[in-house]
Amino acid sequence: MNKPRLFIDSDVILDLVLQREAHFEFAQKLFAQYQQGKCVLYSSSIVLANMHFIIRKLHDITIANSSILFVNKHFKIIDANNHDIENALQSKFSDFEDGVQYFSALRSKKIDALVTRNVKDYKHALLPVFTPKQW
């Protein structure tokens, strides 16, 4: 049986690496599934760049760098291309970043579902979308 391949949005990864109290439990359970070999985790280079910016502002560059190294070790990273950007601009996504991530994941043909706390931002998605709690 193939393991589900999950694209994890930045909010969920930040919940995990920063242990954000309100959401850490479900992000940690999702990561535990990966550690048990029950799923494969994906994210994007855009997520890594945004995470570094956010963590550096909240903490410092050392914590930002170690967080990125953690994600880079455990997640497969998908890149965005020109078509993903054009598709995001022409789509019904109200959040450009979410659109780029979605079209990158869709184009890769490697993703079975998206996991995010912002499910409402993906209401036009063709891929299944779950919160960490739902997954």
Predicted regions and their residues:
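Acidic, PIN/NYN-like endoribonuclease modules and their adjacent C-terminal/linker elements
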Residues: 1-5, 103-135
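Short, well-structured N-terminal submotif of metal-dependent ribonuclease cores
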Residues: 1-42, 56-63, 133-135
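Alpha-helix capping/helix-boundary segments
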Residues: 12, 47, 84, 101, ...
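Short amphipathic alpha-helical segments and helix-helix/interface helices
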Residues: 28-31, 68, 101-102
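Structured helix-beta-strand junction loops
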Residues: 37-38, 74, 91, 125
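Anionic, Ser/Thr-rich low-complexity intrinsically disordered regions
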Residues: 43-47, 64-77, 118, 123-135
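Active-site neighborhoods of divalent-metal-dependent phosphate/nucleic-acid chemistry enzymes
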Residues: 73-117
